[in-house]
Amino acid sequence: MSSERRKDNPLRFALILHLLAVLVQGDIQPRFSCYNHYLAGIRTSSVLPISGHSSAPSNVKCIFENDVAFTEIHSALENSYQVMGKKSVNFQVLDLFHLRELVRRSHCTQTLTVTWKNVPEAGKGGLKVVSLLNETTRIEYSGDERQDFLFDETFAGVRHLIPDEDDNESNPTVTTTRLLCKHIPQPECLVRGKFEVDLEANLEWSYAFSFKTDITNQTLFTLRCGDTTSEVRLENDFFIRADGNAPVAVTHLSDATWHTAIVKHNQPDSHFLKIDDFPEIELGKSISDDTDKTITLSISVNGNIQLIDPTDTNDDCMYSFDKPQKRLQETVSTRTMCVGCGCPKLSGTFDGLSKCDEEDENSYNLRRDVDRLSFIHIDNAFDIDSNGAAIPAISTSFKSDSDVGLIFFGYWQNFHGKGRLQVYYHYDTISAVFCKHTDDEECSSCSIRSSEGFGKDQWIQTILWGGGDEIHLAVDSSVCRLQQLSNISLAEVYAIPQISGGAGLFIGGTWHEKKRRGLYKADAEQKYFENTREKAPVLRGCIKDVFVRGSKTDVSEMFEVQKQAMLNEPDDSNAFAVRKYCQSCIPACSEGTRCRSRAPLQDSAMICDCADELQFNTSEGTCNRERDTPVALSTAFLSENQIVLDIQNTKAILSKVWLKFALPKQINQAQRIVEFNSHRETLFNINLETDGTVNVQLHGQDTASRQLNLLDDRVHLLQLQRRTPMGTRHSAKKYDLYIDGFHTVVSDIGKLVLNNVSVTAAETEDEWSSVIVHDLGLSYEYDEHFAISHPSNVIHQVDLHSQLLPYQIRAPDLSKTGILDDSLWEKPAYVTDSEAAPVLESSPHGEVVDFTADIIEPEQLLSGRWILYSLFLTILLCLFILMCIVCYWCVLRPRAMRRTDTGSQRTIIRDSPDYAPVKMRRDSIGGISIDDDGSIGTDDTDLQAYRDIPSHRVKIYRESMVSILVPSIDQPAEAAIVKRSHSTISDQTPSRPHDTSHAPLVAVNDD
């Protein structure tokens, strides 16, 4: 038996390593905008990388509120600047083509403040402001010292500043706010139904789309080539299954929020799928490249599809008959998706499991108490498989203000074997361990990490379910599979109760230490007590929505059963440190601030811990931060070069130190900024080297450092934050060091009591050469184990910055003290285990540079939108030319032909022997007589006006051989009509026949 297990281990271990790579959150990929990150499943506002299709990424702050994505972009004008000449302004996003496209696709706003410190001569002055999209605004002096302008849409994003006069001291000083762009989704790119795209089978390609659904167990997409088909399905909310292979845990995919899928083909006979920022999943090799056929990607989701591939968005997602490689079959659906509380999850295992963040009247509050136990115990909590191992199907939602705590501890013993499981969290990691004991103990585990940690006083749902080798841990939307690994540590896992039988589950704590005598039954203590040090401590906080064996459990009923089984006096409501209902703060705390007990005692008041937002508690229980008053650490600004600030003694524990500072432009010699001391020795100090390296020195040789850019005008943040140790091991006491987005772990700085803080002023001349301190503070939290009743053992903060202000002899110029940009201090959205992963912090704001004329954006000339515009203009131009041609041939040319005969034609008519002038009369021509010369009428003198033939226009009617001489405007309104025979012209004019003339008669008005 054991030999077979050993033979199977290498193969199983290889498979585990492959699956493990799938379960770890990957690095965040750069995307076009914050909206694209939102479509990739990111819901927490944070600093994220964005880039164009061929540009280097820039890190900007992304804000997600109520399903709306905002992109926050800073510029060099956030620091005040006097405009002394034509200047151009750079932004966090270096690629201006990408930045302009972002502004075009979004609704952006920016505020410009113009300050006239000196009145212009003659009361006149002004400047032109040109936006990123080349919109110009003229600003003139109006008599007010300060003018504010709100720019939006195409006017947002100040790019150029052009003053009326260069090098004029009266020119204004300008500042701008951040450029905030609200993304506007394209309705043309939203698909409800089925979408197909044809791709080349033997070429490298990738295609991206986003999807949103609340239904699991459905087909996500299929790849079809000839007679072969590969199908990818969503299963059991968290899993992807390709072609019937083993399901792969990814994330909660049926949560009615957007996720992004990228299908790739970049290796022979291999196709890959990438979901959000998780590692790629290799699909089955059912489709071969040995063909010249086309691969059809067919996307069909019972929900919504968002087209985000560049081949779609560049054409505004418009398709017609000329693009047969993409086909859309939309369906009309009025169904509303289920979002949030009440939406079922893992319905194949649990009955009515859902994630609800609302307060619940059935919630229970657990406290850490030196005299009393704190947990919920449930008997018969697991089903048992044929091998004697538990099949867990347990879940609860918890919230805690502590960064360490026990969530579940389960155990089972039967004829076939025994085992234990434990789910607990410490700082930024939740871990699950599952051990089954037959001959030897075999354990599997996995962990889920969060950059925000899990002690943030917010509801977190934890689920453990499965059996055999398929046991999974889910924390909110994250999931991992427990696997057998060689480096699993069981030091923090509680032991199986030795004499307990059956299967039981502890929630929120366990019987890990002796408590006050007389409260608990001796047989219960003997049954469950483990006589070892404390490991994962009690979950200090609240629990609700407890599921055991897949069904929701009435915690009140279970707690009553627990008291009957374990208490000497079952009616003693204070025997356990457990209370119904979850305590809250009044008024409610702001977002990002924890509601906590002020002291370790059970009845202590609840307050907001303002240090979470680097603020200070007031006597009214609210949070406050004094107005930003920078202090320059220079002898030119401070009355002393060494300032010692005393700290009052306290029984509380130093939990956080923070320092906001701006660097000088140039450092001539190394400088000690601040030193933290006890009465005996220096605890730690913060130093600045000449190259901009900030060095934190702890206990002599233990140091941590990071080099900063001296040209960066932004205010930096240094934080030291205490990690609560697991159990009672002092060697586990650590502090987290943050310098902006950089993070490392250092040794304990609180071994001795902090008594004073020493601040050093350097011998510098001005603000540019000095360290500028914007804030300096300390935070304390109560000690849970010692001096519990001492009045100083409470949560409080110390404002050291305010204690520095009395030593300031003159205030620095605020325009030279740095830019406050809290996005520089943001923690990353995800925690990665890769040491090579770059620090993800916001990019520099850029600089104000000499005027640089913007060039034409060449890629726009090739975009689908510009092609459509060009085609439309071309069609209009062709129609206009066609109309001109038709007008010329049908109207203008016939008129010109009637009016333009040559003089030679007129001469031929006049000199012809057939020429015989006639006089047209006003009256009726009924009684016409014919003269001897064959003309109508006999008075030749009436025709003298027509002898000058060239002064008349002539038209010859060839059918009747009649010429009409039309007089010009300066001749009498009479005409001569000549009829010619078809015979050859001779010198002798034939006699006129006496019958009626065939020439037409024209009545002419002589007037």
Swiss-Prot record:
InterPro entries: ConA-like_dom_sf (IPR013320). It is a single-pass type I membrane protein. Residues 887-1007 are cytoplasmic. It is found in: Cell membrane; Cell projection, Axon. Residues 1-26 form the signal peptide. The keyword Glycoprotein applies. Expressed in head and tail neurons, the ventral nerve cord, the VulF vulval cell and in the somatic gonad. Expressed in the male-specific sensory neuron HOA. Coiled coil: none annotated. Its main location: membrane. The chain crosses the membrane at residues 866-886. Residues 27-865 are extracellular. Residues 980-1007 are annotated as: Disordered. Keywords: Cell membrane, Cell projection, Glycoprotein, Membrane, Neurogenesis, Signal, Transmembrane, Transmembrane helix. Maintains the normal guidance and termination of axonal branches of VC motorneurons. By associating with cell adhesion protein casy-1, mediates axonal interactions to establish synaptic connections between the male-specific sensory neuron HOA and the AVG interneuron. Plays a role in regulating male mating behavior. Belongs to the neurexin family. Interacts with casy-1; the interaction establishes synaptic connections between neurons. This is Neurexin-related protein bam-2. It comes from Caenorhabditis elegans. The lineage of its organism: Eukaryota, Metazoa, Ecdysozoa, Nematoda, Chromadorea.
